[in-house]
Amino acid sequence: MRFGLNIDHIVTLREIRKTYEPEILEALFIAKNTHKVDLITIHLREDKRHIQNEDVLRLLEISPLPINIECSINAGITDFLCSLKNKPSKVTIVPENRNEVTTEGGLDCSLKGLGEVIRAYHNKGVEVSLFIDPLKDALHFAREHQVKQVEFHTGVYANLHNALYSNANNQIHAISALKDKSPKELKEELHNAFLQLRKMSKEAFFMGITACAGHGLNYSNVKELLKIPSLRELNIGHSVISKAVLVGLEKAILEMAQLIKR
């Protein structure tokens, strides 16, 4: 299983104060020196709430690890990434809403202009991945557009797992739709969410598409996904950075890697 580390929230801390620290390149090399991280993931948002264009340029210039850039189909973002001399190892196209706190679901594959953006990256020799819900129609869209990799949105699975097996439902930001569900209901829905991820990962494999997954994964809920043999990569960020605030980035990475790479 490949471990993709999302370091957006290193930059979130910097941007809160509009200052120079923490340094994203220091985070990059801490990750690299653990010898456990396979790629670095960043999300270049339209609103630039964390990662900036300059961060992209600096990372691509010196990173010893592959860089996966998440982005929308915004024309300005697409033009910027297609113009880069140093190319990312892949671009993962994600849905984006300026009012969202974080990505809320998989990509709408009927989105106008999506096919053109995929072709633009392919024409520049950049691998494309699509961040999708684990649905067959989305996989068929990927295959029709010669997309060789997808990342399944694991938010539904992760939220259900957290509601059932942690104190998430008692926290200030508890998900209202899950608070009133019984443990039996949560367990059944969690089981179904896992089965859907497993089924679509297998479907992707038979289509010749590499299946990755991410969103909301943490030290507790990630373990079950390791039982899906056709999943090849997990992208995890917020949970690792949250633990890093308390124990340090290196230790937080190593603890996650111990779970993923056992």
Curated annotation (Swiss-Prot):
GO terms for molecular function: pyridoxine 5'-phosphate synthase activity. Pathway: Cofactor biosynthesis; pyridoxine 5'-phosphate biosynthesis; pyridoxine 5'-phosphate from D-erythrose 4-phosphate: step 5/5. GO terms for biological process: pyridoxine biosynthetic process. Keywords: Cytoplasm, Pyridoxine biosynthesis, Transferase. The keyword Transferase applies. Signal peptide: none annotated. Disulfide bonds: none annotated. Its main location: cytoplasm. 3-amino-2-oxopropyl phosphate binds at residues 6, 17, 216, 237-238. Gene3D superfamilies: Aldolase class I (3.20.20.70). It catalyses: 3-amino-2-oxopropyl phosphate + 1-deoxy-D-xylulose 5-phosphate = pyridoxine 5'-phosphate + phosphate + 2 H2O + H(+). It is an enzyme of class 2 (transferase). The record marks 151 as: Transition state stabilizer. Its EC number is 2.6.99.2. It is found in: Cytoplasm. 1-deoxy-D-xylulose 5-phosphate binds at residues 8-9, 45, 50, 102. It comes from the Bacteria. One of its GO terms (cellular component) is cytosol. The keyword Transferase applies. The active site is at residues 43, 70, 215. Homooctamer; tetramer of dimers. Catalyzes the complicated ring closure reaction between the two acyclic compounds 1-deoxy-D-xylulose-5-phosphate (DXP) and 3-amino-2-oxopropyl phosphate (1-amino-acetone-3-phosphate or AAP) to form pyridoxine 5'-phosphate (PNP) and inorganic phosphate. Belongs to the PNP synthase family. This is Pyridoxine 5'-phosphate synthase.
